[in-house]
Swiss-Prot record:
CDD domains listed in its UniProt record: MTAN (cd09008)
Classification via HAMAP family: Salvage_MtnN
Protein name, entry field: 5'-methylthioadenosine/S-adenosylhomocysteine nucleosidase
Entry annotation: catalytic residues: 12 (proton acceptor), 198 (proton donor)
BP GO annotations: L-methionine salvage from methylthioadenosine; L-methionine salvage from S-adenosylmethionine; nucleoside catabolic process
NCBIfam families: MTA_SAH-Nsdase, PRK05584.1
GO molecular function: adenosylhomocysteine nucleosidase activity; methylthioadenosine nucleosidase activity
GO CC, any one term: cytosol
Pfam families: PNP_UDP_1
Length: 232
């Protein structure tokens, strides 16, 4: 199995990159692709850049050039579920855009015309993530809806609006729905693994800078365990 792992920022890929054996680097359109083996599994690690356009562009290049069997999106997120704390992990069941509004034409809020209202993560990958999460102690691992938009969620009014639109929302970030949409078009299974670096709307900019490394460590740990689970 050829496993693709996508992180937006240097902090989100650095830990896994250092663990890739026989690593080779390819740069396309300012996106970095690292190929090699992780605990014996064939992997390609992509540093996509931040935001939906960078994520969609780089994921398209990834799928065209490297043809992975599955895609895992990793990194940090802002927490929405009241039960979760900084450092906890969310496994996606579904992913949605929280900044798309074509409701005037009868579409669901967050739905891009011609696309599903929500993008369902692959059940096998969700199960592999849950099985792997059983080996991690001292943090909560939840599964649920993750929403994506090209804004950092620091405004309490915006947080309240998004929460109203998606009452079942667990976390928000800036790439996953774009990655999911490209995977949908290519018919490639995906899952999103995000550790919380902040709680949306609650001094989130300060918390993000302080806890990004902690979030990256937790999400990278689960992704590595998951790679081993998938490679059995």
């Amino acid at each position: 199995m050829n496993i693709a792992i996508i992180g937006a920022m240097e902090e989100e890929v650095a830990i896994l990159r250092e663990k890739i054996a026989n690593r080779t680097e390819t740069t396309v359109a300012n996106c970095s692709f690292y190929s090699g083996t992780l605990d014996g599994a064939n992997v390609v690690l992509l540093k996509s850049g931040i935001g939906k356009v960078n994520a969609a562009m780089s994921t398209t290049i990834l799928l065209e050039r490297f043809a992975p069997d599955v895609v895992i999106n990793t990194g940090s997120a802002g927490g929405f579920a009241p039960s979760l704390n900084v450092g906890d992990i969310v496994i996606s069941t579904e992913v949605v855009h929280h900044d798309v509004d074509v409701t005037a034409f009868g579409y669901a809020y967050g739905q891009v015309p011609g696309m599903p209202a929500r993008y369902a993560a692959d059940e096998r990958l969700i199960q592999a993530a849950e099985t792997s999460a059983a080996h991690i102690r001292d943090i909560q691992v939840a599964k649920g809806l993750i929403a994506t938009g090209d804004s950092f969620m620091h405004d309490p009014a915006r947080v309240d609006f998004v929460r109203t639109q998606f009452p079942d929302l667990y976390a928000v970030e800036m790439e996953a729905a774009a990655i999911a949409q490209v995977c949908h078009q290519f018919n490639v299974p995906f899952v999103v693994i995000r550790a919380l670096s902040d709680i949306a709307g609650k001094e989130s900019n300060v918390s993000f800078e302080q806890f990004l490394q902690k979030a990256a460590l937790h999400s990278s740990e689960l992704v590595q365990l998951m790679v081993n689970e998938l490679n059995k």
